[in-house]
């Protein structure tokens, strides 16, 4: 992904989280229009340490190892400073599942 090309919702990107987490993949959940205008992107980290937690969504075969999207660990990051590099994208069904899990956290039906 070129430095001027903002990531799109549904993109899987490699980025630098911080010194402790290092480079790792993440799913972009904010739309390109927001990412481009603000310079930030909302992302969910991706892990290969699948634990079966309710807010994990299994990632389709895209990574070398089985991986899961951590829907309860949303981060807002400067995608340029974090050197985001697009490595693929998820199908709409995965984005729908991620969105449903996030909504269960922020707008639970009571």
What is each stretch, according to the model?
Residues 1-110:
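Conserved functional hotspots at enzyme active or ligand-binding sites that engage polyanionic ligands
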């Amino acid at each position: 992904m070129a430095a001027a090309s903002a990531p799109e919702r549904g993109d899987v990107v490699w980025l630098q989280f911080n010194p402790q987490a290092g480079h790792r993949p993440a799913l972009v959940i904010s739309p390109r229009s927001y990412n481009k205008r603000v310079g930030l992107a909302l992302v969910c980290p991706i892990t290969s340490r699948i634990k079966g937690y309710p807010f994990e969504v299994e990632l389709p075969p895209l990574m070398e190892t089985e991986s899961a999207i951590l829907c309860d660990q949303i981060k807002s990051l400067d995608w340029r400073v974090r050197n985001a590099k697009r490595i693929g994208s998820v199908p709409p069904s995965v984005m729908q599942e991620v969105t449903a899990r996030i909504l269960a956290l922020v707008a639970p039906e009571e």
